[in-house]
């Protein structure tokens, strides 16, 4: 059985975020989430209150941001 294209995109984005040194957390945030740094650590929070499509958009936007900052290769 082949993996759904949306899940492939999700997995690729999360892998890229992790490779950039971010800890990925999936939490119920009521509409929040994204990249942040505190306590000397880097985090990506994915809001489980959002739909998979919204979470995917959030993750892919984080990847774009990391690419713009040079933390992920193109």
Language-model segments: what does each one mean?
Residues 41:
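An anion-binding catalytic pocket shared by soluble metabolic enzymes
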Residues 64-74:
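Catalytic Zn2+-binding segment of zinc metalloproteases
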Residues 55-66:
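Short alpha-helix carrying the canonical HExxH Zn2+-binding catalytic motif
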Residues 2-4, 45-57:
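Short pre-active-site segment immediately N-terminal to the catalytic Zn-binding motif
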Residues 1-33, 38:
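Auxiliary, metal-adjacent structural segments of Zn-dependent hydrolase domains
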Residues 28, 47, 67:
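His/Glu-rich zincin catalytic helix
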């Amino acid at each position: 059985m082949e993996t759904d294209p949306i899940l492939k995109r999700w997995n690729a984005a999360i892998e890229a975020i992790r490779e950039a040194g971010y800890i990925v957390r999936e939490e119920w945030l009521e509409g929040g989430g994204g990249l942040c740094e505190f306590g000397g650590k880097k985090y990506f929070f994915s809001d489980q209150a959002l739909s998979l499509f919204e979470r995917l958009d959030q993750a892919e936007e984080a990847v774009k941001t990391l690419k713009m900052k040079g933390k992920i290769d193109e």
